[in-house]
Amino acid sequence: MINCLIVDDDKKLLQYVSSHLERESIQTHTFTSGEASLDFLENKNVDIAIVDIMMSGMDGFELCQTLKDDYHIPVIMLTARDALSDKERAFLSGTDDYVTKPFEVKELLFRIKAVLRRYQINADNELQLGNLILNQSYMEITVGSKTMNLPNKEFQLLFLLASNPKHIFTRDDIIEKIWGFDYEGDDRTVDVHIKRLRQRLSKLKSSVSIQTVRGQGYRVDQNV
């Protein structure tokens, strides 16, 4: 089931949009302020967010940028503001789509599904574990707004571990999968790569860490 965050200070609109989306089997979580929605996201995950611009406190532009930078959530702006300058600012903030009020709920539904399809295509080359996102296309890792490119072997090693959380890989397992059967170098090269990855993850303040299981090998854990 799709989980949708809706943030708008108009309670009637929240109820209207929520009721229609729920009929389409989309679970909704509604909030009248950006601050409240971010509190919710501390413990819950959503697939997409619908955000108004004009709200007291944190406005929609600021909320959109936070959702994109810190949570990597697709965003649709739903607002009465139709000036080109507002649209420009919204897209610069990271929004994936922009819908002006008044609107047809069916059109909003079409746009939700279209945005999610685009994200699914992008997600095919990405893996997320905790707050760490690994992008295979660019061999880069991202935590929040910080991105770091990794050398090929380091990325492959981290991707292998992150794809199998809690699974313990021996040095031989890792060498076979990353360097290949015909590798003739020192198996301590694995330790060197692990050390570098730990330094990089620490620098990014990732919730993911690489643990040594004494006498067995390595695995990834998420720090709480």
Curated annotation (Swiss-Prot):
One of its GO terms (biological process) is regulation of DNA-templated transcription. Phosphorylated by HssS. One of its GO terms (cellular component) is protein-DNA complex. Its main location: cytoplasm. Gene3D superfamilies: 3.40.50.2300, 6.10.250.690, Winged helix-like DNA-binding domain superfamily/Winged helix DNA-binding domain (1.10.10.10). Member of the two-component regulatory system HssS/HssR involved in intracellular heme homeostasis and tempering of staphylococcal virulence. Phosphorylated HssR binds to a direct repeat sequence within hrtAB promoter and activates the expression of hrtAB, an efflux pump, in response to extracellular heme, hemin, hemoglobin or blood. This is Heme response regulator HssR. The gene is hssR.
